Amino acid sequence: VNAIPSAPTVDPSNTTQYCLGATASSMSAVSISGYTLKWYDNADNLLATGSTGPVPSTVASGSTTYKVTQTNGTTLCESSALLVTVTVNALPSISVVGGASQTVCDGSSITLNGDGGVSYSWSGVDASGNAISNGASFVPPGSTTTTYTVTGTDGNGCSNTSSINVISTALPTINAGSDVEICAGETVTLSGSGAGSGGSYSWSGGISDGVSFTPTVTTTYTLTGTDANGCTGTDQVTVTVNAIPSAPTVDPSNTTQY
C-alpha cells in the first residue's frame, strides 16, 4: 500500500486577485522532488502539468477555482487537491463630481473632485503650468477648453478613468457709454452694452439701466455687466452736472421809459 502524497504548496498563496483586464501570470506551485504537478479546473478537467500552471483569464469579473495535485513518479499515487482561487475584481466606476463639462470665467478658480474610488490622481495643468490635484482649487488656462482626466483607484487597487472639459470663457467687454454733460435739473439715461444676449446690467448709485433720472451733482457711475455664462466686466461713465447761471442784470434797470 503506497502512501498518498501530501498536497503541493502554491507560491505565493492559494488566493490570487487581479483587476479586470489586467495581464495575469501563470500559476505556480512547489512539489516534492520527483513528483509531478497536475492542474485542473473546478470540473476536474486537466489543464496543465508541471510547476507552471495555467494563466487565469481576466476578461470577466468573478472568482474561479483551480485544483493542483502532485503525483508520485514511482507509485503514481496522486495527492488530494489544493484549491486555488483566482478572483478578478471589476473596475471601479469613476466619475467627476459636477459632470463631464464645466464653464468658468477667465481668471476664476475651479475645484475638481473624483468620485467612485478611494484615491485619485489628475492629468492636466493649471494656468501656470502646475499639476492639479483632487479637491484643490486652481485657475485653468484662459479662453480655451482644457480636458482633465482623473484616475480613481478603489480598495482592491483597481483603477479606472473619467474626463471633464473645463471651458474658460473670456470676460465680456462692457461699455458704459461716453461721458455726459447736462445742466442742473435735466434728465439723463445711461445704457450699457457688451453683455450679449441673455446678459444683464447693474449700475452704482441706485440707478437702472435704460431708465432716465435727474442727477444733482457730478458723479462717476460704475456699470457691471454680466453675460449668459455669469462672467462679469465693468466700465465707468461720468455725468457732469453744470449749474444754471443766474439771470443777467439790465443797466440802469429792467424798466426804461422814453
Describe each region flagged by the PLM.
Residues 1-5, 85-90, 164-170, 237-243:
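Interdomain boundary/hinge segments at the C-termini of tandem beta-sandwich modules
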Residues 49-66, 132-149, 209-222:
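Solvent-exposed segments in extracellular or luminal domains encompassing
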Residues 4-13, 91-99, 171-177, 244-252:
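Proline-enriched interdomain boundary motifs that mark the N-terminal boundary
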Residues 19, 74-81, 105, 155-161, ...:
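Short, exposed coil/turn segments at beta-strand boundaries within extracellular/luminal domains
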Residues 31-41, 116-124, 195-205:
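Solvent-exposed loop segments of extracellular immunoglobulin-like
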Residues 13-18, 99-104, 177-182, 253-258:
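Short beta-strand segments of immunoglobulin-like
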Residues 21-31, 106-116, 186-195, 257:
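A short beta-strand segment in extracellular, disulfide-stabilized domains
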